[in-house]
Amino acid sequence: QDAARRDFTCNALYYNPARGEITDFHHGVADIRAKRLVMIGDARARYQEDPVRMLRAARLSGKLGFQVAPDTAAPIAECLHLLPKEPLARLFDEVMKLLFSGAAIDCLKQMQALGMDGQSVHPLLACALERLPENQGRGIVALALNSTDSRLRADQGVSVGFVLAAVLWPQVREAWQRAQSSGLRTMPALSAAVAETRAHMEKGWGVPHRFTASMREIWQLQPQFEHRRGARPFRLLAQPRFRARPRRRAAHPPPGSVVP
């Protein structure tokens, strides 16, 4: 019964340490060997039962390098409308698992391959998907996610606030430019753009305040990058907000860091 409640066949394997045996109720071993992600049961019914499984399909297949089985992928398009009805906190948690999976770029590309446009899932993913191709894949979003993937694969700590600030910086920058065009000076315009973006994040996106606070600090430091002489650039590089926390094995990770 427990095996039948699992979502994918690769997650329904049971190991008996006393006998050194794996019990496989749903042909999961064969699917793993074939690098194939297969839903247990009727995929449409399982997505309707728990829409977050669609995000899990993109994340697991992207991270593991699996192909999603046709019967598992086919119902996603008609079930996508169910995802926004899920609690914001749960969706945000799944978004974090995807962005900090160690294979964020591959997971996002898999979302696209499965027909999952970011806006139907979560605004953070919509921003990431929209900006990913910028500068031939070397824009700020792609660079930040690639750097995060590399650090996670190297078992190093990462800063959630820094990564999310990078993903949303193009949006903040555009709002900043609009505010300046309306007549506001540099810093008041930036503060207005940051406040506008934070309001969206905290009310409609489910992003916790502890992350938006560090993101605000990072955004408000951006004008200082224009000062490139003397000691100021070196002081800026030493800013704690631009430094990832060291990896720590702890029951409760420090706020602002992710330990996969």
Feature map (PLM): residue ranges:
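Catalytic cores of the polymerase beta-like nucleotidyltransferase superfamily
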Residues: Q1-P260
